[in-house]
Amino acid sequence: GEAKMVAVLRTFGDEVRETAIEEVNRICKGIGIAFACDIEVNLEEGYAATYNDSALIDLVESSATAELGESAVRHITQPFSGSEDFSFFGKLTGTPCAFMMIDAGHGENPVSLHNGKIVFDEKVMVSGVSAMSRIALEYLKK
């Protein structure tokens, strides 16, 4: 017989990611030995963790606050485990990064981003473009 397992591995840092991959391989090898079967591990390199530049985060936060008001900006301090290709931009180019999100959902019981029932408040796009423009202009002044 044959079995197939597919999983997504998300980590908050490169070192932890390397350790996790080593552990997946070690555990699979052990299972193969324990059950006298062949196990093949195929790992596809996905998206790495995004590292936010603290100075750039300060600029993004202050610019967005100046443009939209303090009540419209929320600093997220906990790591975010969404899978995002944004990390490659910073890693490949060596460019400082600051990941920000724009909340365009609304309602009492919001649904997740990838839900077919999500409804975006398109008026938020104006605020988002306004904030990003301000951020870009402030960045260019430095």
Q: What is each residue range found by the language model?
A:
Residues 1-142:
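Metal-dependent amide/peptide-bond hydrolase catalytic core
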